Every structure is written in structure tokens, then in C-alpha cells.
Amino acid sequence: MPIRVPDELPAVNFLREENVFVMTTSRASGQEIRPLKVLILNLMPKKIETENQFLRLLSNSPLQVDIQLLRIDSRESRNTPAEHLNNFYCNFEDIQEQNFDGLIVTGAPLGLVEFNDVAYWPQIKQVLEWSKDHVTSTLFVCWAVQAALNILYGIPKQTRTDKLSGVYEHHILHPHALLTRGFDDSFLAPHSRYADFPAALIRDYTDLEILAETEEGDAYLFASKDKRIAFVTGHPEYDAQTLAQEFFRDVEAGLDPDVPYNYFPHNDPQNTPRASWRSHGNLLFTNWLNYYVYQITPYDLRHMNPTLD
């Protein structure tokens, strides 16, 4: 949240030089507050588990957030009860005339599937096109990052030979960037993906600003300068046991997966893993809600300014 100070306080300019968000008394007196409307497009098979993970992060902000869950796959789910979907999810037709402060598009286990072979690929493109005029800021996670880069920037699918799985170290590139406000210089975050995100590719083919990357030069966190879109290539929402569940699932399926990197104590899958990324995940989502959504969204959502083209 911003700090409120007198208009003429000398510290105002000093802090702004460090990109600290300062709200003067004159601005604060005219600020109107209402709950934020955030739409979550949940593409994960285990929807209830994914809901829990994202809602936990969104609840860590002092801002009041109204959540709407969205699904675009009309096929019968094998992992989520139909009753749950019918009771708590809307279809795109239900909300296409509405505006939202924020949109989160989750990952999906589609890393080895060509885009045009994804059953709901046309619907993904429809939602992203719609979001340009109806959403203040959109956050893409993991596979959704790859999909958005293709749809918005025409970048072909980049696929790794082996799955990247584990907890990796990252470093921030812009210490005063709003989305990385309060981050340690280096931090840990989990990855579970076949998608590849070389930082050089992002720099060469987009105008997006890379805010954090891995030691190997993969982009982890990047965003547009107008804050309308942000991308996180890992899974900061994951629970402590999620990577373990994925690993043992693949073992049982006979896929011979590598043990997730830097995850199990002593690299032994029989040991109980611990989450080493919770503070990072909470801070990332708090920053996104505050600086990318709350501070730039109009009080009256009917006055949305479409600028994403």
C-alpha cells in the first residue's frame, strides 16, 4: 500500500527517485475505494486445489478482493466434481459484457501439446482479445505465459527437451521496479514446465521489461511498461507438496522423471519437502494487486481505458 505524506514533504521526491509509491495528502483526499474485481481463468485439471493456492496468495493483501472463477472448457472434468463447477464457475458468455480490475490466467499441463491441438485454444484467444478492453491488468502464469506470448506477440512455442522441475534461484534486474518491490536480491521459486523462456527471446521479440531471471538466463518475471500485462513463468502459488505429488505421479506412470532440483532435503524423495518460496509468492501477488491493479484501475469500471494493442 502507498504511504500518505504531506504534499511538500522533502522526502516525497527522494522516495519517488527510488520508485517508492508515495501518495500526497491532496491525492489521498480524493481517492475512492471499493472492492477489486478479479477474474481467475482456471485451466488446471485439479481446480479446487488450484483455487486454494491462488486465493491464499490473493488474501494476503489488505485490499478487499471479489473473486469470480471462469472456465472455458465445456468437456466433462475428470478431476473436479460437476457440482462444484456448476456452483462456483461462470462461462465466458456470462461475463463478456463486464469489466474487471484484474485477470489471472493459470498454468495448464499442456507443455507438449501444440497450440492448435489444445481443445480450447480458440476460447483462450477470445478471452485474451476480450481482456484488452475489459481488464485493467492481467497476470499470466507458466503455460499461460507461453500461450499469451504466442497470441499477443506471435512468438512460436519454445519447448525444452527435458522437463524443468524443482526450486530455482532467481535474481532481480531492476531493484526499484514496482512488481519486485521488497524482493530479496535473489529468491527461490518453483518451476514445473516443458516451456522454455530464454530472456534473449523476450528482449528480441517484445517490448516487455524483464524484472527477474534465473541464473541460467531464463526469464522468470516480466511485464509491459503500462502494467496491463505481467508474466510469471514459474509456480509461486504451489504448495509445499505439489512438486512431490507431480513427481510421484510421473513415477507411477513409468515416465522416469528426474528428482525435482533443490526440493527434497538431501535430494531424497523419501524426505518431506519444505516450501522455501512462500514469502516471495505472497509479495509478488500483493505487489501485483496494489501497483498493477489497484493504483491504476478506474473507480468506475465503466470508464475502462483500453490501451493494450
From Swiss-Prot:
Its main location: cytoplasm. One of its GO terms (molecular function) is homoserine O-acetyltransferase activity. It is found in: Cytoplasm. The active site is at C142, H235, E237. Pathway: Amino-acid biosynthesis; L-methionine biosynthesis via de novo pathway; O-succinyl-L-homoserine from L-homoserine: step 1/1. The keyword Ubl conjugation does not apply. One of its GO terms (cellular component) is cytoplasm. Keywords: Acyltransferase, Amino-acid biosynthesis, Cytoplasm, Methionine biosynthesis, Transferase. One of its GO terms (biological process) is L-methionine biosynthetic process from homoserine via O-succinyl-L-homoserine and cystathionine. Its EC number is 2.3.1.46. The record marks G111 as: Important for acyl-CoA specificity. The record marks S192 as: Important for substrate specificity. SUPFAM superfamilies: Class I glutamine amidotransferase-like. It catalyses: L-homoserine + succinyl-CoA = O-succinyl-L-homoserine + CoA. Substrate binds at K163, S192, R249. CDD domains: GATase1_HTS (cd03131). Pfam families: HTS. Homodimer. Transfers a succinyl group from succinyl-CoA to L-homoserine, forming succinyl-L-homoserine. NCBIfam families: metA (TIGR01001). Belongs to the MetA family. PANTHER family: HOMOSERINE O-SUCCINYLTRANSFERASE. This is Homoserine O-succinyltransferase. The lineage of its organism: Bacteria, Pseudomonadati, Pseudomonadota, Gammaproteobacteria, Enterobacterales. The gene is metAS.
